[in-house]
Structures are given as C-alpha cells and as structure tokens.
Amino acid sequence: MTGKLGPDALATALAATGAADPAVAQGPAYGEDAAAIDLSDAGETLVVAADPLSLAAESVGTLAVHVACNDVAASGADPRWLTHTLFLPDDDPDRLRTVAEQVDATAEALGVAVVGGHTEVLDALDRPLCSMTAMGTTDRFVSSGGAEPGDRLLLTKGAAIEATAILATDFREECLEAGVPAATLDAAAGFLDEVSVVPDAAAVRDAATALHDPTEGGVATALVEMAAASGAAFAVERDAVPVRPETRACCDALGVDPLATFGSGALLAAVPPDRVDDALGALDAAGIEGAEIGVVEAAESDGDAGSAEGDAEPGTVRIDGEALAEPPRDELYPLWEARE
C-alpha cells in the first residue's frame, strides 16, 4: 500500500547506517528529514536531505525541488546545491522537457544550483519519478528533535497548502463535480507558488529549538514525528491550526482532512515562550502568516501512558485532547488509488 512506512518497519531501514563516522552530527532517525555533517575546518555544518516525488503529475519537477530544499531549510541551512535523479516511463521528449524546465525554473528561483544527477527510462513506471538530494551549510543546525517542555508550537501559512494545489490541478474535474467554484480552484492552484518554506525557516530559525516541515500525512504526521524525535508530547488545538478557505473547500468536497494530507508550504516550529513574539514578528516582517497552535509537554521516561498532562508516552500528540493512535496515512492516496 502506497505511503510512508510505519515507525516499526522504518526502524529496519534506519538501523542500516554503514561505517561509523565521527563527523556525522545527525544521522538517520525517526522524525529527522536531514543529515548533518560536521565540517569542523570550515566552522560549518553540511546539511543533506533526499526526497522522491511521483504522484503530483502536473507539477512533479517543481514539487520535487521544493520538498528537498524545504528539508534543508527546516534544518537551519540555506539550500545551495541539488542533485537530480529522474526516472521516466518512456522517452517522450515533451515529458522530459516539461520536468526539466520545472526543475530548472524552481531551482533558479530559490538560488539553488543543480550540480548533477541521473536520467533514464524505466518502463515499469506509469509516471515520472523525481528523486532530489539537496545540500546547504549552516553555522547552527536545527533538528526536529530539539523541542523542550514548555515550548510553544507555531505553524506558518496553514495546513494542506501542497494538497490544495494538487486537488485543484490533478483533481480539478472531481472538485468541480462536487461543487467547488472554478474561481476557487484557480486560486487554489496558485498555492503551488507557496510550497517553499525557505523564507519561513530563515525568519524563525534563530528563535526555534526545533523545526519540521509537514509533507506526506500533513500537519498531524509532522506533529507526531517532531514529538517522537524530541522525546516529548504535544497538545494542539485543531481550531488554532490555520486552514484557508480554498483548502477547506477542496478538502471538504473530496472528503479529505486538511490536517492529514500533503502539507509542504507550512513550517512547524517549537519556540521558547519568551521568543514567540520574536518569531511571529519575524514572520510578519517577511510577509508570512504564523499562528500558535499548541504546546510541548513533558513525556514519561518509563513509557507508561496516562491521560493527565505530562504523563504521555514520547511522541504522543493530542488534538483537542484526543491522542492520535498513529501517524495518519495521507488522505490523498485513496483518491489516486481510485483511479487505478
């Protein structure tokens, strides 16, 4: 079944780390989307992140660049370099040109150089598959796992920014049939221009103890991953999570929970309470919406779960007091699968 591996299955992959290297400051771990390599001689940390993209047929090249660069940005670095592996289902030159032009334009807009890659035809596929590796450097690496009890949880822009653009393009006819006005879909398609969190991260990284960008599984999954990586529990108010009218219209029309679907475009930040105003002010100065959606709580070290504040298992996320049993499967997958 298409989608992310669960934590137990993922542990098998995360354990395969090859040779030990003392320069690795952050290696594979649940909830961490980027690696950090200590470049001591340069006084910097190299941040590396890899991401594949295949299902957003209309904008696969654009989104592939953004999701990889977002992971680097959400680690406190400015993305600078990309390598690009592209698998095509056939040798259609128009398809290749479309993806290549999307990659080129998006990388140029972000100020990122495409420095290498690989391209080939794989006839087992029915759509292009882009896999990007993004790299950048920073003097302060920010992991997903640094959230501390008492920190406030901030979210930029809103839930399901990426999913809204996908619904408005790949599922436009279905949305129209469900009664979504064409003008709403036209506006929603423009959300593709907002899936980068590079400016969001630049605005809040100095104040943040932890950063994480929602992708597959949306804000809900990002919360679980960040809480687990931090060994903490999160308490979130659903009504505090920004959901734009276009997002609500598209998601309601096709029965999708905005908190449980592709969320690129939003950035989740844990910020000490005395830095919340600084972070929100920096976002406002950059022209980016930001909202406080919850709080980081202490978790039980012995793993015993309870209902009172501060005694939940690490990784527990409560939304309006109700604990998520597990990270949700992204709610766009059933829509794609219904077409197969």
Predicted regions span which residues?
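Extreme N-terminal cap/leader segments of soluble proteins
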Residues: 1-56, 106-107, 111, 331-340
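General beta-strand structural signal in soluble alpha/beta enzymes
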Residues: 25-29, 48-49, 114-117, 155-157, ...
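Small-aliphatic-rich amphipathic alpha-helix that forms the alpha element of a beta-alpha
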Residues: 57-82, 99-112, 199-203, 221-225
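Glycine-rich anion-binding loops of enzyme active sites
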Residues: 78-170
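Active-site-proximal betaalpha loop/short-helix elements
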Residues: 91, 188-263
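Helix N-cap motif at beta-to-alpha junctions
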Residues: 270-276
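Acidic, Ser/Thr/Pro-rich beta/coil linker or hinge segments at domain junctions
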Residues: 283-340
